[in-house]
Amino acid sequence: MSETIDTLETLLIINSGTGVLQQCFVNFPYPITGAARWLRDIGFCLWILEIVLFGFFTGMLAWRYITHPVLLKKNMMEFPTSSFLGAIPISFNTIIQGIISYYDYRTSARWATFALYWVALVMSLVISFGLVIYQMSHAKPQKLSDVAGVWVMTTVPLFVTATTASSIVPFVYMESTKCAIALLVTGFMAWSFAIAEVTMIVTIYFFRLIADKTPQAPLMVGSFLPVAALSQGAYAIQRFSIFLATYIKNGYAPTQVNPPPLSQATLLATSEVIHWMGIILHLFLIAHATFWVVQGTTSILMSLPKLQFNIAYWSAVFPMASYANAWCFLSRDLRDDGMRGWAATMVMIATLLWLFCALETAYRGFWLGSLFSAPGLEDWLGDGEQEQDEKSRGGRKDAWNGSYTMPPPGSQDEESGQANGHQSSEGDSRRRN
């Protein structure tokens, strides 16, 4: 794995951080009315910026893979940096969340988000399951030191998709109960899959931090990425619990008849229990995320002398914005002033971090021209051409990664008895006869 990771794939993480930050302004813990509504307007501007960046970067990435198909294969086998492809469904999901945040009063917007959700779900499954399976079956053998926080990006898309489902389900419920239940079930299943996957990945990553030397300086910022997964999961499960509690409170019971077989008091008590279960799970996951915030901050402070700005810094914006957004929603639900203040502080930190990365990216990338690069791109293209050449000449295909290996010079001659200019005895006898 290269020491720098300023490739086109990593640029997509800019969209993810921008998209979640605009959600922080939408869910800001203090009432947004009157003059304070400018926060929501800033969030809308960030949402438009995210759409533009998403179209630009995704279009560039698609063009690269269309013109050079070998790069897609090579990138998917480059563990763990191939996990940055997870930024595509993440950004797509935050765009969907923006639609329902700013146009929730429109029926067309509700149905549009419902349709786009299924596209996002398929994209997330391709990354969270397809990419992992591909890495298991095709990537080179890895050492423990190769594991980095970037690997968590394979499971974050499912969490963000669950967040999308939890955000749009109350509005789709206004149009169709069946569609809302479909969102609830599939969104909760995505959340459950993501919980199982992130538990395994984070456990391996934590063991790697203890048992092996610290990651390379450019990859240290990836220590924050577990924060993104856990924070998105916390936000999603609380919103699911609120919707399910409301649904039960309105008279639903599993053995549905009219009137319901359970009393209204029982339904109200059940809905309150479910709501508080969501809050407890939120607190559990956000506490776990807080541990990784402390761990990531400590790692960055210890590596400051070696760190230079690169696109990987955006890997900290997305997790911190997700962390702030989770606290914002929790503080609004519990109506606790202390939590509101903490959530507002985290939003400010995430905003300052976004501004720092944006200014550094503009200065180093567009002014100095020293930021955007694709290390090893020429080598990858050359390797692809060499593989095609070896394939055409009858090279042996390696099963573990699909590449071709040519036999040593003269080996085929030795097998037929013709090495070093000597012919086989069988051939000599034919000529004598």
Which residues does each PLM region occupy?
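C-terminal functional regions that serve as terminal interaction/effector modules
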Residues: 58-60, 279-299, 315-402
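Membrane-interfacial loop- and helix-cap regions that link adjacent transmembrane helices
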Residues: 168-169, 178-182, 187, 194, ...
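N-terminal signal-anchor module of multipass membrane proteins
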Residues: 1-60, 67
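Membrane-interface helix-loop-helix junctions at boundaries between adjacent transmembrane segments
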Residues: 73-81, 100-156, 166-191, 210-218
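The first (N-terminal) embedded transmembrane alpha-helix
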Residues: 6-28, 87-98, 152-167, 195, ...
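Intrinsically disordered, low-complexity terminal tails of fungal membrane proteins
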Residues: 1, 377-433
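Juxtamembrane membrane-interface segments at transmembrane-helix boundaries in membrane proteins
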Residues: 1-5, 29-44, 72-83, 105-114, ...
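Membrane helical hairpin/interfacial module
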Residues: 36-110
